[in-house]
Every structure is written in C-alpha cells, then in structure tokens.
C-alpha cells in the first residue's frame, strides 16, 4: 500500500513560502479532485487524498498509484498555485508507509506545532479529513489513518499534561503584545477576523487586562456575536480605516487569500494619530501589528514605516520556545503513545495485504459452489423449496468451513508481516493469479520518494 505524504511546515519553510502554497477552503474541492481523478486518460496520482492546510503547515496525504513519484506531487503544487517549483521544493519533506502514520499522529497530538501541545491542531486535522470525506477522496486507508491519528491526539491530551498551560497561537500573540507594551489596560486593541483564533485572542486579551477591544470582520454577524460575548465594540469591515486610526495594537487572523492591510492603510492611520495629538513635538505614534494569518493579512512592507512593529506567526517562537524544555519528560510519554497508535495502524495495514487474495478466493469458491449446486439441483428436480434451501445451506456451510482455516492463517500471517509470502502461496494453490497481480500493483512503487532524490 503506497501511503505517501508530501508537505512543509514552520520548521522547513518561512511564512512567505507557506502562504504561497496554502489551500483555502474554496481551493480544497478542486485540489482533491485533481489529485484523485484521471486526467486525459492518465491515471490519477492518488486513489485517496487529504490536504491539511493550516497557518503552520501544508501537507498532502495520499494512497499513491503505481508510477506516482514525488516529482509528480511537486509539479501538482507548482501548477495549482502557479509557482515555480524551484521556489519551494527545498522546503518539502516526503514520507512513506509507517513514517506517514507517525508524522500524522504526532501532528494531531500537538507535538509538531509551533506552540507545543496546542489543542487547535486536532480540530484542524479532523476538519481536513471531513472536507476530503465530503469530496469523496477518502477511502478505507486514509479513513483508518486519520481515525487513529485523532485517537492519538486525544490520548496524549488525556494521558499526559502536555496541554496543561499550553499556549495557543492566539495566546502567544497576546503574550508578545504584553512583553512589548507591558500593561494592556487602556490600550486600543483591534481584532480583525471572526473565527476561533480571534475568539481565543479576545479571551487572552481580557485575561491580560485589555479593556478596550474593537472587532472587525467581513461577516458582521460573527463580529457582533464576538463583541457581545467579550464586551467589545463591533465595526463593519468598511470602517477598517477608522478602526486602524484608533488602534495601538492590531491582531489579524482572517482567511483572506491576499493582504487586507497595505502600507497606505497604516500610513494614513499614523497620520491621523499624529494630527489628533495636541503635542506637536511628541514622538511619532507607534502601532504594534500581529499577523496570525497564513496567507498573511498585512503586507510585509508595512514594517518599513517608522513607529510600526510588525510580527507574523513565525515571530512567536521567542514566546513559546521555552515550552519544549519545560515539557521534555511529557514529550517522551506522548511519543510512546504515538508509537502505540502507529503500531495499531501498521498492524491493520498489514492485514490489508491479505484482502485481494481472500476476496478472490471467496469469489472463486462461490463460483464453484453455484456451478455444482445448479448441476445437482437439475438432477434432483423433484425437491420441494424447503429441501432445496437445505441443500443450498449445506453447500454454503461446507464452503465456509473449508475456507475458514486458510483465511484465519493468512490474516494472522499478515498481522505478523508474512502476508505477502502466504498470499503468494495461497494464490498459487488456488490458481488466483489475478488477485496476486492486483496485490502486487497495490504494494509496489517502493521508489516513490527515492526518485525525487
């Protein structure tokens, strides 16, 4: 089974590259269909696919067809996002087989997050799986993989203290503001966005003393709901220039595909602040901008303006780096749980080696049973319906009893890594060459990533 992963994350690629390869919710259907549907007679790259795209990672999980190479996936990313492969290929990582399961389980557990142990990633993994399921690109392998990964995440959070005191990206952003500005009381804080990140930011701002919040979002109903919950002022998106002119701190986290704040927006806000000051000789006004979105909400050249301090998600490392040292013992326990879940998936995957041969064996047995039963019933034409049912039941029982030992033996052999050997023997004994060829195709292509390198 060609289980495959190609991706990049905050450890391999800066936000400038991650935002170029990010998949929006509107992108996902077409991207998943391109990965799993034939194109001009050519087979698709994958029989199953899930795309996990968050502010810190872009990953494609799939069951690859024979002939699919890592270069094919690089080409897909380049073509879909209209970016030259040379601009990002050096940031990609590739995994196969059990390593894919290990990576996803650790990811769902928060072990590969910028903010160690953060809980949001588990919901993001689930959302990615459900989105692919709605498109129809999830089959039995990725279904099993993602369910086991979600269990890994849940177990790590329940069986360790990794989530105790763990920050979120939002909390880290607020902590960054507190470190830069000190007391947040009396500061004008503008939150842009109406999703989970903004809500968590509002919670943490209030917990850190902020008492003057304004929320702006394209969907005014979501902004109004957040404002009501946290005692904030709500403004329509069209009032963003006005909100910027009042703000000391801006925390932005929308899902916009391009920036919503450009240099001229902040320049105008600073000019307005300066005009409103009674003191002509005062220092120029300052603004702290924290961009938690990927793709970024705030244009990078905004940071060139005097008095402006712009931070992205990649700048949060200084706030959260200490958590790795503080939780090293907990990480060891979490990794043990991850390994247990990986073994469970690997055991299940090995049993799948037996399925093509077992399916063909039962189909062949059923063909023989039907042929012989039809021949016998033609000769016993005086039987009543009840007698015919008895004979048919007898034939089924004989077949099931005969097939039970080899079926059990092959499943057990597969669970212990001997499935290929036993399946080959069984296929030869029962003349099931077609099943053997099918299995070989499903198990082949071991050079999937080697060809890339």
Curated annotation (Swiss-Prot):
Matching Gene3D superfamilies: Glutamyl-tRNA reductase, N-terminal domain, NAD(P)-binding Rossmann-like Domain
Catalytic activity: (S)-4-amino-5-oxopentanoate + tRNA(Glu) + NADP(+) = L-glutamyl-tRNA(Glu) + NADPH + H(+)
EC number of this enzyme: 1.2.1.70
Name of the top EC class for this enzyme: oxidoreductase
Disulfide bonds: none
Binding residues for substrate: 54-57, 113, 118-120, 124
Keywords: Chlorophyll biosynthesis, NADP, Oxidoreductase, Porphyrin biosynthesis
Biological function: Catalyzes the NADPH-dependent reduction of glutamyl-tRNA(Glu) to glutamate 1-semialdehyde (GSA).
Domains as described in the record: Possesses an unusual extended V-shaped dimeric structure with each monomer consisting of three distinct domains arranged along a curved 'spinal' alpha-helix. The N-terminal catalytic domain specifically recognizes the glutamate moiety of the substrate. The second domain is the NADPH-binding domain, and the third C-terminal domain is responsible for dimerization.
Family the UniProt entry places it in: Belongs to the glutamyl-tRNA reductase family.
Additional notes on this entry: During catalysis, the active site Cys acts as a nucleophile attacking the alpha-carbonyl group of tRNA-bound glutamate with the formation of a thioester intermediate between enzyme and glutamate, and the concomitant release of tRNA(Glu). The thioester intermediate is finally reduced by direct hydride transfer from NADPH, to form the product GSA.
Protein known as: Glutamyl-tRNA reductase
Organism name: Chloroflexus aggregans (strain MD-66 / DSM 9485)
Gene field: hemA
